[in-house]
């Protein structure tokens, strides 16, 4: 039995989306984000894709985003020889600026990998989120991830904002919050994600 590994999952019977599907999606996401915590992070580390995710707790999200998300991946990309010292300096500089770029809010429970491939429609026509990489973070991280690869209509963002308003200026921070998943894709797949991540970092420094 030691040669086998099992994964037991709940079966979700598929169905068709209801007319108010995206409003329901926004309500469920807002309900998820309404679960708050005293620190950013999680009591244990986990994974995003096959990459480890460091979740040690931080009081300020700017510190968490730098030390637990951006810089570990920059180190990995340097180890993979995608980045050199010159590129690393850009990310170090950005990390020092994050406290001026990201507004404070309560740590919210995030899905953590909310792209269009990570939700299903169940037999009642309701949205179901799957395959999370959860931690307590900044809500704008989930919102930005939803916009990275598309697949979500504008009405879901409008409905979310009505349920749980985002902090003023959030649209200007979308690229900043997309930096982490772009770095993840750079480490996993290389290619255009490497210059894209560097371009995002430079745009905020």
Describe every region a protein language model picked out.
Residues 61-66, 75, 106-109, 116, ...:
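Active-site Asp-x-Gly
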Residues 1-63:
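ATP-binding pocket architecture of kinase catalytic cores
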Residues 22-25, 87, 91, 197:
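Hydrophobic packing residues in well-ordered alpha-helices of helical domains and bundles
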Residues 28-32, 199-204:
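C-terminal alpha-helix
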Residues 37-109:
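An alpha-helical support segment within catalytic cores of ATP-dependent transferases
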Residues 34-38, 70, 103, 165, ...:
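Generic structural signal for secondary-structure transition and capping sites
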Residues 8, 180-187:
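Conserved PLP-binding active-site segment of the aspartate aminotransferase-like
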Residues 2-5, 12-15, 115-116, 133-136, ...:
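Short, solvent-exposed loop/turn segments at secondary-structure junctions
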